[in-house]
């Protein structure tokens, strides 16, 4: 595995790794290796949150992150192409923190896909220790035909509050 030290390189590696996982037509062994590789970019104890997601539950360990990534191919059924584009990394006054703007573009079921993302990521000792991943979950649900499931999850969440 390539050892990354620069926070921008690590976030770019995550984006490219997710792209390969989602659209790379990997066999089971390749998929497992890709999941391990992606998870290894995160610290054993981490704090990854998706504030705009319906569940909003934090990912606290490398194993949580791996399980999260393992769900990606099922969330993206029918994807023909899925790649990060327009990736721009903003350096901050804190050398551990970068803000990354990009979109995943591709196609699913013959329809174009464009999902906007902003990641605020803290990297220490070459691994991600904290990240806030703001993704367009409504756009993703629309692109992958999951709007009814998203609406049901939101309705269920409303009834539990």
Where are these regions (language model features)?
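Short N-terminal micro-motifs specific to bacterial/archaeal maturation
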Residues: 1, 29, 55-56, 131
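Short, low-complexity N-terminal intrinsically disordered segments enriched in polar/charged residues
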Residues: 1-40, 44, 150-161
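A solvent-exposed, acidic/Ser-Thr-rich amphipathic alpha-helical stretch
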Residues: 34-96
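Alpha-helical interaction segments
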Residues: 27, 32, 58-59, 92, ...
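A beta-strand edge to alpha-helix "cap/lid" segment located at domain peripheries
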Residues: 1-9, 73-161
């Amino acid at each position: 595995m390539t050892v990354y030290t620069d926070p921008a390189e690590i976030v770019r590696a995550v984006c490219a790794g997710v792209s390969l996982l989602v659209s790379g037509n990997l066999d089971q062994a390749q998929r497992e290796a890709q999941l391990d590789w992606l998870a290894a970019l995160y610290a054993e104890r981490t704090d990854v949150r998706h504030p705009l997601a319906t569940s909003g539950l934090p990912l606290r360990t490398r194993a949580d992150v791996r399980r999260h990534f393992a769900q990606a191919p099922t969330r993206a059924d029918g994807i023909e192409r899925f790649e990060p584009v327009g990736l721009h990394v903003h350096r901050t006054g804190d050398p551990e923190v970068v803000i990354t703007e990009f979109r995943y573009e591709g196609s699913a079921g013959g329809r174009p896909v464009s999902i906007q993302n902003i990641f605020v990521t803290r990297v220490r000792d070459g691994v991600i220790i904290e990240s806030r991943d703001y993704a367009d979950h409504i756009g993703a649900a629309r692109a992958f035909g999951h709007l009814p499931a998203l609406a049901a999850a939101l309705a269920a969440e409303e009834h539990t509050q």
